[in-house]
């Protein structure tokens, strides 16, 4: 009979678990959702959209609306592709239903 060697834990030397290494998980790309200024959409409507769709506080919604008004474009938030796409569609749908020309886009961060 051959003598088997054991380490300090009592496990036979040379035995162990074979493990597979997982490939690194890639983080999803993020997209900025942007509102574009126009001369016709009421400021109150923009604040309402920011509060309802983007869950902004009244203060944040007013600040973003003023930034859009003064600079021509403003960021509403940063989201994964699917969420950003949904938010853009919701804004465009709300604007269309209210008969406002408000435009919303997304761009890769």
From Swiss-Prot:
Region of interest: Disordered: 1-23
Q: Which GO terms describe its biological process?
A: protein catabolic process; proteolysis
Q: Which Pfam families match?
A: ClpS
SUPFAM superfamilies associated with the record: ClpS-like
InterPro entries given in the database record: ClpS, ClpS_core, Ribosomal_bL12_C/ClpS-like
Signal peptide residues are none
* Coiled-coil boundaries: none
Which domain of life does the protein's organism represent?
Bacteria
Oligomeric and partner information: Binds to the N-terminal domain of the chaperone ClpA.
Q: Which HAMAP family does the entry mention?
A: ClpS
Its family remark reads: Belongs to the ClpS family.
Function, as annotated, reads:
Involved in the modulation of the specificity of the ClpAP-mediated ATP-dependent protein degradation.
Task: Tell me what this protein is called.
Answer: ATP-dependent Clp protease adapter protein ClpS
Q: Which organism is it from?
A: Maricaulis maris (strain MCS10) (Caulobacter maris)
Name of encoding gene? clpS
